[in-house]
Amino acid sequence: EFSNATGLTTVALSDTTIDATTLAATINSIDVINGLNTTLMTLAAGATINIDASEIATILGHETGSIAGGSRLTISDQNIVVTGNISVDDANLLSATTTGTVTASITTTESITELKTLTETSNAYTIVISSADATATAEDLSAIDGKTTATIDATAVTSISGTYDEVTALYESTGVDNLGDEAISISDELTV
C-alpha cells in the first residue's frame, strides 16, 4: 500500500517459505526507500519462516518494535523453523508470537527445571536431557514430554523416581526415548 503523504505503509509478502535473513534485508531496503516512515510487512498466512538461532532477537525486534523504526513485521500464524540450538526463553518468545508451530532444538544444557517452563504444547522441540539431570523424576520427564510433539532423548538419565503410576506412564509413553536401563525408585507402597 502506498500513500503520497506517508510513502509505503504496508507490504504483503505472499511467499509460503520465508528466509529470515532475506526478510531482514528487505525490511532494511524498504526503510531506505521509505525514509523515516514505518512500513508494516505482513506475511502469508501459514507461511514458514526459516530462521537461524542468531537472528531471533532481530526478527522479534522487528515484530515487537523494540528495534528503531517501530513494529515493522506481523508474525501471527506462521510456522517458524530454527536452525541451531535455542534457549527455553527464546523458544517461549517465538511461541508467544505465533499460533503456528515452532520447530527447534533446545540447548542441551537446559535443566529439567527450565525445560518445564516451556509454555506451549504443540511445538516440535528436539530436547535432550542433560547429564546434569541424570537423576530425574517420572513426573518431571512426563511434564516435559507434554511440552513437545517431538521425542525427548533421555539417554543421560540413569535414575528415575516416582509413584508406580507415574513411572508406568513414563515408560509407556512414546514421547520419551532411550529409557530402559535406569535405576527405578517407586515412592508408593505396592501390593502383590
Segments from the language model and where they lie:
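Solvent-exposed, low-complexity segments and loops of surface/extracellular structural proteins
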Residues: 1-192
